[in-house]
Regions:
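C-terminal catalytic domain of Rieske-type non-heme iron oxygenases
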Residues: 1-183
Length: 183
């Protein structure tokens, strides 16, 4: 998967996730299938000295029961279910992100941070730290989306092709096209 906008848009996130500095989200280059970097696991991981997605990469929240030590060491594990919904597991919390179209140029974004029962009450002072980086990344993405939308309205805009790293988006386009043709 790609994150080719990450280096220029998300400096705070790239500090925590070194692979994102290269515009990638996986150590496997989707164009060639060749390993990228020196990871034995194809998934991206937090950098040395970081444990989770907070501005300083640290957390005082308890670890979530269930994930393996290998998954916890990554600092983040993504699961995408559709082009508009994904779950992100961190060692100390889970985040869901849902995009719901509201019109041709509007989308509703819902981000939920999930904790095991009782953790929010026992660690109230840590909650802002938990959501701070996520809110920042969402705001940065929102601004870029707004600028992109302005460009799409330009008389000079010409439709292009998707990059090889955008394979999941291509699959979504094909799925949508099949649904529209069948309707």
């Amino acid at each position: 998967y790609e994150c080719y906008h990450c280096p220029g848009i998300h400096p705070e996130l790239c500090r925590i996730m070194p692979l994102y500095r290269e515009g990638l989200q996986s150590y496997t280059d989707s164009r060639t299938g060749a390993p990228h970097g020196d990871a034995s696991d194809s998934r991206a991981r937090v950098g040395p000295g970081f444990a989770t997605w907070t501005l300083d990469g640290q957390s005082k929240l308890p670890l979530i029961d269930g994930p393996s030590e290998a998954d916890r060491a990554l600092g983040v594990v993504f699961a995408s279910f559709t082009a508009s919904f994904f779950i992100v597991m961190h060692p100390d919390y889970v985040r869901t992100v849902r995009l719901s179209p509201r019109g041709p140029e509007q989308v509703e974004l819902t981000v939920d941070w999930l904790l095991p029962p009782g953790v929010a009450e026992r660690h109230a002072g840590e909650l802002e730290k938990m959501v701070e980086l996520g809110r920042m990344v969402v705001a940065q993405d929102g601004r870029v989306c707004e600028l992109n939308q302005q460009g799409l309205r330009s008389r000079r805009h010409r439709q292009g092709v998707l990059m090889p790293q955008e394979e999941p988006l291509h699959e979504f386009h094909e799925w949508l096209h099949r649904r529209l043709v069948a309707a």
